[in-house]
A protein has these predicted regions:
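Charge-rich, low-complexity N-terminal segments
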Residues: 1-41, 85-88, 138, 149
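Ordered, soluble secondary-structure elements with a strong preference for glycine-centered loop motifs
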Residues: 2, 6, 64, 68, ...
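Charged, low-complexity, helix/coiled-coil-prone segments
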Residues: 9-23, 50-68
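A short beta-strand-loop-alpha-helix capping motif that often carries His-Thr
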Residues: 34, 87-99, 136-142
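Short, well-structured hydrophobic secondary-structure segments
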Residues: 35-38, 42-58
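Short, internal acidic amphipathic alpha-helical interface segments
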Residues: 53-98
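Ampiphathic alpha-helical segments that act as solvent-exposed interaction surfaces
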Residues: 73-82, 101-131
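Short, highly charged C-terminal tails/helix-capping segments
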Residues: 127-149
């Protein structure tokens, strides 16, 4: 691992500690930092390029085979997306945003995490229903108190 990547990984860990209010964050087996946003499984990843970058990505829906109808739907979603990229890869609908380490701070990382997680959560159930897939996590049902109605 390059010195630049080690520095960036340390910086990302510190930002995630601040975001999640914990004293230590733990990377998964791939070296990414997982989190959940509704029905979406999300990760923060430090990319080991010549110039390291940070990618925030999510699985919105899984088990969805590629089709012309799916790609047309994803194109429509992508055209409305402001700060996230939506694409299909290996039977999964992915949402991601890549960040430069220059100027990376708590605010910019939080924006990326909320944008990616929010889009993935917003589109996951719809796409899973339309294309016979599933979301990484089940939808959280809100219990309705019948006496309150």
């Amino acid at each position: 691992m390059s010195t630049k990547k080690r520095w960036l990984r340390s910086h990302v860990e510190r930002l995630l500690q601040e975001e999640w209010g914990v004293c230590r964050v733990v990377a998964d087996a791939d070296g990414d930092y997982p989190y959940r946003s509704g029905t979406a499984a999300c990760w923060v990843q430090v990319l080991d390029f010549e110039r390291p970058m940070v990618r925030v990505f999510a699985h919105a829906a899984v088990g969805i085979p590629r089709s012309a109808k799916l790609l047309a739907e994803l194109n429509d979603i992508q055209n409305r997306a402001m700060t996230a990229t939506v694409r299909w890869y290996d039977d999964a609908v992915l949402v991601h945003q890549t960040l430069s380490p220059h100027g990376l701070n708590h605010k910019s990382l939080r924006q990326a995490m909320q944008a990616v997680g929010g889009v993935a959560d917003d589109i996951g159930l719809l796409l899973a229903g339309m294309f016979s897939g599933s979301t990484p996590f089940p939808a959280e049902s809100s219990a309705v108190d019948e006496e309150a109605c």
